[in-house]
Protein backbone atom coordinates (compact mmCIF):
# COMPACT_ATOMS: atom_id res chain seq x y z
CA UNK A 1 0.00 0.00 0.00
CA UNK A 2 1.23 3.41 -0.91
CA UNK A 3 -0.64 6.67 -1.18
CA UNK A 4 1.29 7.61 -4.33
CA UNK A 5 0.59 5.38 -7.37
CA UNK A 6 3.70 6.74 -9.08
CA UNK A 7 5.90 5.14 -6.41
CA UNK A 8 4.44 1.68 -6.90
CA UNK A 9 4.46 2.15 -10.68
CA UNK A 10 8.13 3.14 -10.61
CA UNK A 11 9.14 0.12 -8.53
CA UNK A 12 7.01 -2.27 -10.59
CA UNK A 13 8.06 -1.04 -14.05
CA UNK A 14 11.61 0.30 -13.90
CA UNK A 15 13.94 -2.59 -14.92
CA UNK A 16 16.68 -1.72 -12.41
CA UNK A 17 14.24 -1.34 -9.54
CA UNK A 18 12.41 -4.54 -10.53
CA UNK A 19 15.73 -6.35 -10.36
CA UNK A 20 16.51 -4.78 -6.99
CA UNK A 21 13.14 -5.83 -5.52
CA UNK A 22 13.31 -9.23 -7.25
CA UNK A 23 10.11 -8.45 -9.15
CA UNK A 24 8.13 -8.48 -5.90
CA UNK A 25 5.33 -6.34 -7.33
CA UNK A 26 4.58 -9.05 -9.91
CA UNK A 27 4.27 -11.87 -7.38
CA UNK A 28 0.82 -13.50 -7.21
CA UNK A 29 1.05 -13.00 -3.42
CA UNK A 30 1.18 -9.22 -3.79
CA UNK A 31 -1.73 -6.87 -4.30
CA UNK A 32 -0.86 -3.22 -4.73
CA UNK A 33 -3.27 -0.72 -3.20
CA UNK A 34 -2.84 3.00 -3.71
CA UNK A 35 -4.87 4.68 -0.99
CA UNK A 36 -4.65 6.45 2.34
CA UNK A 37 -3.82 3.63 4.78
CA UNK A 38 -5.98 5.10 7.55
CA UNK A 39 -9.06 5.38 5.34
CA UNK A 40 -8.41 2.02 3.70
CA UNK A 41 -8.25 0.22 7.06
CA UNK A 42 -11.48 1.93 8.13
CA UNK A 43 -13.28 0.69 5.01
CA UNK A 44 -11.69 -2.73 4.57
CA UNK A 45 -13.07 -5.91 6.14
CA UNK A 46 -10.15 -8.25 5.36
CA UNK A 47 -8.05 -9.91 8.05
CA UNK A 48 -4.28 -10.15 7.87
CA UNK A 49 -1.83 -12.65 9.28
CA UNK A 50 1.07 -10.26 8.80
CA UNK A 51 1.33 -6.53 8.18
CA UNK A 52 4.42 -4.40 7.62
CA UNK A 53 3.69 -0.84 8.71
CA UNK A 54 6.53 1.21 7.24
CA UNK A 55 5.30 4.78 7.18
CA UNK A 56 7.54 7.85 6.86
CA UNK A 57 8.58 9.29 10.19
CA UNK A 58 5.97 11.46 11.97
CA UNK A 59 7.29 14.84 10.87
CA UNK A 60 3.84 16.47 10.66
CA UNK A 61 0.23 15.92 11.77
CA UNK A 62 -0.77 14.19 8.52
CA UNK A 63 1.88 11.54 9.09
CA UNK A 64 1.45 11.62 12.86
CA UNK A 65 -2.15 10.37 12.54
CA UNK A 66 -0.73 7.09 11.19
CA UNK A 67 0.96 6.53 14.56
CA UNK A 68 -2.10 7.28 16.73
CA UNK A 69 -4.18 5.03 18.94
CA UNK A 70 -6.99 5.47 16.38
CA UNK A 71 -4.82 3.93 13.64
CA UNK A 72 -3.57 1.08 15.84
CA UNK A 73 -7.16 0.34 16.90
CA UNK A 74 -8.02 -0.11 13.19
CA UNK A 75 -4.95 -2.29 12.72
CA UNK A 76 -5.96 -4.42 15.72
CA UNK A 77 -9.39 -5.04 14.16
CA UNK A 78 -7.78 -6.22 10.91
CA UNK A 79 -5.20 -8.59 12.42
CA UNK A 80 -6.18 -12.25 12.58
CA UNK A 81 -6.13 -13.97 15.99
CA UNK A 82 -2.49 -15.02 15.51
CA UNK A 83 -1.59 -12.07 13.31
CA UNK A 84 1.53 -9.98 13.68
CA UNK A 85 2.35 -6.46 12.58
CA UNK A 86 5.82 -4.96 12.50
CA UNK A 87 5.83 -1.18 12.85
CA UNK A 88 8.72 1.12 11.84
CA UNK A 89 9.17 3.25 14.95
CA UNK A 90 12.11 5.66 14.41
CA UNK A 91 15.41 5.51 16.30
CA UNK A 92 15.33 4.63 20.00
CA UNK A 93 18.82 6.13 20.22
CA UNK A 94 18.19 9.57 18.69
CA UNK A 95 14.43 9.87 19.26
CA UNK A 96 14.04 7.90 22.47
CA UNK A 97 10.83 9.50 23.74
CA UNK A 98 9.28 9.24 20.27
CA UNK A 99 10.12 5.54 20.13
CA UNK A 100 8.64 4.74 23.54
CA UNK A 101 5.59 6.89 22.71
CA UNK A 102 4.90 4.54 19.78
CA UNK A 103 5.32 1.48 22.02
CA UNK A 104 2.95 2.94 24.62
CA UNK A 105 0.41 3.90 21.94
CA UNK A 106 0.36 0.37 20.51
CA UNK A 107 -0.14 -1.02 24.03
CA UNK A 108 -2.93 1.48 24.73
CA UNK A 109 -5.26 -0.23 22.24
CA UNK A 110 -4.81 -3.65 23.85
CA UNK A 111 -2.18 -5.05 21.51
CA UNK A 112 0.91 -6.73 22.88
CA UNK A 113 3.85 -4.55 21.90
CA UNK A 114 7.28 -6.14 21.71
CA UNK A 115 9.92 -3.44 21.18
CA UNK A 116 13.12 -4.27 19.32
CA UNK A 117 15.95 -2.53 17.53
CA UNK A 118 18.57 -3.30 14.93
CA UNK A 119 21.40 -1.51 13.20
CA UNK A 120 20.32 -0.57 9.66
CA UNK A 121 23.33 0.53 7.56
CA UNK A 122 21.51 3.38 5.82
CA UNK A 123 19.74 4.63 8.98
CA UNK A 124 21.83 3.66 12.00
CA UNK A 125 20.25 2.25 15.16
CA UNK A 126 16.57 1.82 14.30
CA UNK A 127 13.55 0.73 16.28
CA UNK A 128 10.52 -1.35 15.51
CA UNK A 129 7.52 -2.65 17.41
CA UNK A 130 6.12 -6.12 16.91
CA UNK A 131 2.37 -5.87 17.58
CA UNK A 132 0.20 -8.91 18.20
CA UNK A 133 -2.91 -10.06 20.05
CA UNK A 134 -0.91 -12.64 21.99
CA UNK A 135 2.47 -12.14 23.70
CA UNK A 136 5.30 -12.78 21.25
CA UNK A 137 7.38 -15.85 21.98
CA UNK A 138 10.80 -15.84 20.38
CA UNK A 139 11.43 -18.84 18.14
CA UNK A 140 13.94 -21.40 19.36
CA UNK A 141 15.07 -22.12 15.80
CA UNK A 142 15.23 -20.05 12.63
CA UNK A 143 15.14 -21.13 8.99
CA UNK A 144 18.43 -22.21 7.42
CA UNK A 145 20.19 -19.76 5.12
CA UNK A 146 19.29 -16.47 6.83
CA UNK A 147 22.13 -13.98 6.43
CA UNK A 148 21.89 -12.12 9.73
CA UNK A 149 19.28 -13.59 12.07
CA UNK A 150 19.87 -16.70 14.14
CA UNK A 151 18.91 -18.16 17.51
CA UNK A 152 22.17 -16.66 18.84
CA UNK A 153 21.66 -13.13 17.51
CA UNK A 154 17.88 -12.72 17.91
CA UNK A 155 17.82 -12.14 21.70
CA UNK A 156 20.02 -9.06 21.23
CA UNK A 157 17.26 -7.39 19.20
CA UNK A 158 15.10 -7.21 22.31
CA UNK A 159 17.79 -5.91 24.70
CA UNK A 160 18.00 -2.14 25.06
CA UNK A 161 21.15 -0.54 26.48
CA UNK A 162 20.88 2.11 29.16
CA UNK A 163 20.70 5.04 26.71
CA UNK A 164 17.73 3.46 24.89
CA UNK A 165 15.77 2.20 27.91
CA UNK A 166 12.07 3.16 28.22
CA UNK A 167 11.19 6.73 29.16
CA UNK A 168 7.85 8.26 30.05
CA UNK A 169 5.72 9.36 27.11
CA UNK A 170 2.10 10.16 26.37
CA UNK A 171 -0.15 8.01 24.21
CA UNK A 172 -0.24 9.55 20.72
CA UNK A 173 -3.84 10.49 19.92
CA UNK A 174 -5.50 12.36 17.09
CA UNK A 175 -6.32 15.19 19.50
CA UNK A 176 -2.83 15.63 20.99
CA UNK A 177 -0.29 14.50 18.34
CA UNK A 178 2.24 14.07 21.16
CA UNK A 179 4.51 12.03 18.91
CA UNK A 180 4.93 14.82 16.35
CA UNK A 181 6.06 17.17 19.13
CA UNK A 182 8.49 14.63 20.64
CA UNK A 183 9.88 13.77 17.22
CA UNK A 184 10.43 17.38 16.19
CA UNK A 185 12.18 18.27 19.46
CA UNK A 186 14.42 15.19 19.47
CA UNK A 187 15.54 15.29 15.85
CA UNK A 188 16.27 19.04 16.08
CA UNK A 189 18.95 18.17 18.63
CA UNK A 190 20.54 15.71 16.18
CA UNK A 191 20.15 17.70 12.95
CA UNK A 192 20.03 21.42 13.83
State what each model feature region is.
Residues 86-88, 114-115:
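Short catalytic-loop micro-motif centered on adjacent basic/acidic residues
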Residues 43, 112-192:
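Soluble small-group transferase modules, centered on the S-adenosyl donor enzyme superfamily
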Residues 1-86, 93-102, 107-109, 122:
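The AdoMet/dcAdoMet-binding core of the Class I SAM-like
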Amino acid sequence: MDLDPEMTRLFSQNPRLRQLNQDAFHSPKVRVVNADAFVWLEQNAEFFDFAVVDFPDPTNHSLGKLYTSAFYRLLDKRLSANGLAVIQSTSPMFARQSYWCIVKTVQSVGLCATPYHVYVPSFGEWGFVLASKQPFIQPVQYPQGLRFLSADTAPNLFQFPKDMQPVDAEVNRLNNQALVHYYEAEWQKVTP
